[in-house]
Amino acid sequence: EALAEMYYQSSEQFYRRQEIDTRKLLFEYYWIDLQEAARKAGRDQDLNAGGYTNSKGQNFSIMGHSDRSKFIIKEVINVFPDTLTWVHDFTYAYNEPMTKNYFWHPAYDDYPVVGVTWQQANAFNVWRTQNMMNAWLMGEGEPFINDFRLPTEAEWEYASRGGLDLSPYPWGGPYIRNRQGCFLGNFKPLHGNYTDDGGFHTVPIDSYSPNDYGLYNMAGNVAEWTSTAFDESVYDFDHDMNPEYSYDALANDPPSLKRKVIRGGSFKDVGLYLQTGTRCFEYQDTAKCYIGFRSVLTYLGRGKAVNAEDL
C-alpha cells in the first residue's frame, strides 16, 4: 500500500496491467549545508565598514549578500535498490538468481533490504517522515514527531550491546555458539564456509534470537549504515555526551570525505566484524548486497503518568 502511488493510475493503465510509473523512480528532497553556513557565520564581519576581516587579519570588501539558497542542497535519489549488487560484489560467483528474485519475490518479504546507498537510506527516512508519519499525524490532528533518521555510531553500539556493557557480542559472552554448538548469528564461520550457521546469503530477520533490548540482527546477516562519518581518530576528539562526528560530503568531495561508518558485520564477514565494538566503513554513494539499514527516532520524553501502570 505504501508504494501504491508508484504505479500508473487505473486511467493510465494499458490493458489494466499494473506498471511502475518511471517518472516516480527518483525522490527529490532538500537539506541545508550547515558546515558552509557555520564557516560563513564565523567570519568577523564589519558591515558598517562594508567589509569583513578573517582570522588572519586580512580585509575584504563585501560584494553582496548571498541568499539562503546557497546553503540549500537539492538531492535527487533513485528510489529502488541496486539489484545488480549481488553480481558486482562477488566476481566469478553464481548469484544471478539472487539478482533476479531478491527484490521482488514474496519469498524474500521478511529478508533485509540491501543494495541501498547511505544517501538512499537518508532519502527514505525523509520520505518516511514527511509523506508517511507527519502527513498522517497532521490529518489526525496529532503533533509531529521527530524525524526518522539513521542511528549515530554511538547509538547503534549502545543498542547492539543490549545493556551488556562488557560483552563483545549482542547476545552476551565471548562465544559465537550456544551450549548446543549452534551459531548465534549469520556470518562466515570459516574460509569458504557460509552455511554452517544456517544461512548461505541473507536470512529472514527473525532467524536468530534478539538481544536483551529485543533487537534482531544487531550482529550478522547484513551490516548497517550509521549517520556517522568515518575517521580513524574520532575517539580522540568526539564528545562524551551523545558523541557524533558528521560530514555532509558533496558530489565533488574526495572519496576520503565520503566514508560512513557501518556496523554489525554481515553474512560474508568473519566473527570479528560481529563484535559490538568493531567499526568499518563504506562510501556514501556505494551500494552493497551485504549492507542494509534501520531507522531510529529521537526520544521525545515521557508524558504525565496517570497511574503506576503507565510508568
Give residue spans per PLM region.
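C-terminal beta-signal and terminal closure region of outer-membrane beta-barrel proteins
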Residues: 283-287
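Short, structured beta-strand segments at or near domain termini in extracellular proteins/domains
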Residues: 289-305
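Low-complexity, serine/threonine/proline-enriched polar segments
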Residues: 2-43, 47
